[in-house]
Amino acid sequence: VGLKLIDNGKHPACLLDAENLANGIYFCITKDVAHNQTYFFMDDWNISWKQYFTDLAAMKGKTIGSSIPFWLAYFVASVAEIAFPLVGKNPPLAKKSVKATGTNRTISTQKARTELGWKSEVNYDESMRRIKESLN
């Protein structure tokens, strides 16, 4: 069956490269202004789930499957989460995954950018290059 996009993969992929996260954590530890504060980190790549999954699949010479609407994916996940454990198996689709890729989950990183001076140092192309390298 393969990977199916939810709502054509139109929603933003809320991605965060590990190095960019590490930089954010470093700023939280080393900057006094961060004491007792909460910050959100998310790369500003403006990449859709469709592009991200297409790029990942291409690394392995694969293509992504068709798309299903959010409501159908959520319904299937809801049923699977009940039915599969009854036969001792993990469901192939989870409601949490459907929500993560089938809705807009972007967050504001303005506070981290303003107060900590944080930004995405590693860009999308470099992050994808690193992922591809790790797969080989």
Predicted features along the sequence, with ranges:
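A short C-terminal helix-loop "cap" of Rossmann-like NAD(P)-dependent dehydrogenase/epimerase domains
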Residues: V1-D7, K89-P91
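Amphipathic terminal alpha-helices
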Residues: I107-E115, K119-N136
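Mid/C-terminal beta-alpha module of Rossmann-like enzyme folds, strongest
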Residues: F27-P92, R129-R130
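Glycine-rich Rossmann NAD(P)(H)-binding loop
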Residues: I6-H11, Y39-N46, A57-K60, T101-T103, ...
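Residue-level signal for the nucleotide or nucleotide-sugar donor/cofactor binding architecture
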Residues: A13-E19, I47, I107, V122
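Conserved C-terminal active-site "lid" loop/helix of NAD(P)H-dependent oxidoreductases
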Residues: A18, Q51-T54, V79-G117
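Substrate-positioning beta->alpha
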Residues: D7-I29, N36-Q37
